[in-house]
């Protein structure tokens, strides 16, 4: 896997919820769903290069999958990795596209 490919596969999508919206307003922390292979340094490099911002710190946690039933079939949701990315002062990522 080339370095450009790894950057694009590291950050999967932003994780948007009421809690993450509050974090982004209060202390410029953006939450991303990231690849399971990614570590803090991978996430930092990917966010800095893809969004052209300065990253101050990265915290990562693993979210366990939950048991779910689909009718009579037992299954579950997949486990995934979440990254809290704190941006340096004066930097911002705008996902909406409005200026």
UniProtKB/Swiss-Prot annotation:
Source species, domain of life: Bacteria
Pfam families according to UniProt: Ribosomal_L23
Matching InterPro entries: Nucleotide-bd_a/b_plait_sf, Ribosomal_uL23-like, Ribosomal_uL23/eL15/eS24_sf, Ribosomal_uL23_CS
A GO term for molecular function: rRNA binding
Keyword Metal-binding: no
Keyword ATP-binding belongs to the record: no
S-S pairs: none
GO-annotated biological processes: translation
Oligomeric and partner information: Part of the 50S ribosomal subunit. Contacts protein L29, and trigger factor when it is bound to the ribosome.
UniProt similarity note: Belongs to the universal ribosomal protein uL23 family.
Functional summary from the UniProt entry: One of the early assembly proteins it binds 23S rRNA. One of the proteins that surrounds the polypeptide exit tunnel on the outside of the ribosome. Forms the main docking site for trigger factor binding to the ribosome.
Protein name: Large ribosomal subunit protein uL23
Annotated organism of origin: Francisella tularensis subsp. tularensis (strain SCHU S4 / Schu 4)
């Amino acid at each position: 896997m080339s370095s450009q490919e790894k950057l694009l596969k590291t950050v999967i999508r932003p994780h948007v919820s009421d809690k993450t919206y509050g974090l982004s307003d209060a202390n410029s922390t953006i939450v991303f769903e990231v690849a399971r292979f990614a570590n803090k340094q991978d996430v930092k490099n990917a966010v800095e290069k893809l969004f052209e911002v300065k990253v101050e710190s990265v915290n990562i946690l693993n979210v366990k999958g939950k048991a779910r039933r689909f009718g009579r079939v037992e299954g579950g949701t997949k486990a995934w990795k979440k990254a809290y990315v704190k941006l340096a002062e004066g930097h911002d990522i705008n996902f909406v596209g409005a200026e």
